[in-house]
C-alpha cells in the first residue's frame, strides 16, 4: 500500500520557474519525463502600421521589405503586394469570382496561393504577379508557409500537412497537440526560426508548434490587441508575418485597420 504523498507515487509533478513562466513536467515512477505543458508568452507592441480594413486577411508574408497578402471572400479575393509603412497596395491581382483566397507562401521567385474549398492552388511570379500555373489540392486550403524545404499547410483540422515544393503533393503530416489535447482549427501559418506559428480560428491566440513532433511549445495570447471596428464575428485574428533579417514579428486580422509589430517576452 502506498502512503499519501509518497515519493514512490506513480506520477509526480515538478514545477520549474523559467523566465517568469511556470513550466510543468509530469514525471513517472521510472523518472521518465513526459511532454511539458506549453509556455504562455507575454508580448509588447513595438509599432503599429495601417492595414486595409476591407482586406479579409487569409495569408501574410514579409519578404524583401514588402508585405504580400492574400485576401478571401468569393468575388473579392486577391493577392496583394503592400507597403508596410503606409499600408498602400502596390500591386494586386483579383481572383476569379468563384475562388476564395487563402494562405500564401513565397518560394524563391514564386508565390503559392491556396483556395478554400475549390481544391486548387495558384502559382504566380513574385515580381509581376503573372499566373504561371495551378495545381490540385485534395484538401481544403487554409494556411500555408515554407520552411526552406517543404510547404506546410493547414486545412482547419488539427494536422499540419507537408507538401513537396515542386509537385505540391502531400508527402507527410503531423497531428498538433498541447500535451494530450489536440489543437484544431489551425489557420494562417508562419515559419519562424524552426517553429510554425499558427492562428487558431476564432481565437485571439497563436500556437507555437514544433513541426517535427506536432507539440505546441507555447501560446501567445493577443486578446489585448484592438481588432476590427464593430462587432463582426468574422473579423478574427488572422495573419502572421516574420521579418527574418531584422527579427520582427507582425500580426493582424480580417478587416483589421491596424497591423501590429510585436515582441515576445523573453
Task: Give the positions of each predicted feature.
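A short helix->beta-strand "capping" segment at the edge of beta-propeller domains
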Residues: 34-53, 87-88
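Beta-strand-rich domains and repeat architectures in extracellular enzymes and scaffolds
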Residues: 46-78, 93-105
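Surface loop/turn motifs at the tips and blade-to-blade linkers of beta-strand repeat domains
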Residues: 48-53, 93-97, 133-138, 175-181, ...
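Signature of short aromatic-glycine-proline-rich micro-motifs recurring in repeat-based ectodomains
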Residues: 57, 186, 232-241
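Conserved beta-strand position repeated across blades of beta-propeller domains
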Residues: 61, 103-105, 145, 190, ...
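Short coil/turn segments that connect the beta-strands within blades of beta-propeller domains
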Residues: 64-65, 108-109, 148-149, 193-194, ...
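Conserved beta-strand positions in repeat-built beta-propeller and related beta-rich domains
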Residues: 68-74, 111-118, 153-157, 198-202, ...
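Short loop/turn segments that connect beta-strands within beta-propeller blades
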Residues: 83-87, 125-129, 165-168, 210-214, ...
Amino acid at each position: 500500500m502506498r502512503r499519501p504523498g509518497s515519493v514512490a507515487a506513480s506520477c509526480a509533478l515538478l514545477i520549474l520557474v523559467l523566465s517568469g513562466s511556470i513550466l510543468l513536467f509530469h514525471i513517472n515512477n521510472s523518472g521518465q519525463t513526459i511532454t511539458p505543458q506549453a509556455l504562455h508568452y507575454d508580448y509588447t507592441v513595438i509599432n503599429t502600421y495601417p492595414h486595409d480594413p476591407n482586406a479579409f486577411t487569409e495569408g501574410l508574408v514579409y519578404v524583401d521589405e514588402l508585405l504580400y497578402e492574400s485576401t478571401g471572400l468569393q468575388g473579392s479575393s486577391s493577392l496583394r503586394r503592400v507597403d508596410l509603412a503606409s499600408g498602400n497596395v502596390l500591386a494586386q491581382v483579383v481572383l476569379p469570382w468563384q475562388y476564395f483566397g487563402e494562405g500564401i507562401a513565397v518560394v524563391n521567385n514564386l508565390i503559392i496561393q491556396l483556395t478554400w474549398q475549390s481544391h486548387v492552388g495558384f502559382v504566380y511570379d513574385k515580381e509581376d504577379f503573372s499566373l504561371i500555373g495551378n495545381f490540385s489540392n485534395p484538401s481544403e486550403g487554409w494556411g500555408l508557409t515554407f520552411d526552406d524545404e517543404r510547404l506546410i499547410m493547414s486545412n482547419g483540422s488539427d494536422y499540419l500537412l507537408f507538401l513537396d515544393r515542386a509537385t505540391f503533393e502531400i508527402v507527410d503530416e503531423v497531428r498538433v497537440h498541447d500535451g494530450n489535447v489536440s489543437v484544431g482549427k489551425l489557420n494562417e501559418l508562419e515559419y519562424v526560426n524552426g517553429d510554425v506559428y499558427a492562428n487558431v480560428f476564432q481565437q485571439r491566440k497563436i500556437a507555437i508548434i514544433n513541426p517535427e513532433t506536432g507539440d505546441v511549445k507555447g501560446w501567445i495570447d493577443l486578446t489585448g490587441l484592438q481588432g476590427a471596428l464593430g462587432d463582426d464575428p468574422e473579423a478574427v485574428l488572422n495573419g502572421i508575418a516574420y521579418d527574418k533579417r531584422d527579427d520582427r514579428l507582425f500580426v493582424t486580422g480580417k478587416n483589421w485597420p491596424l497591423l501590429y509589430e510585436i515582441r515576445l517576452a523573453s
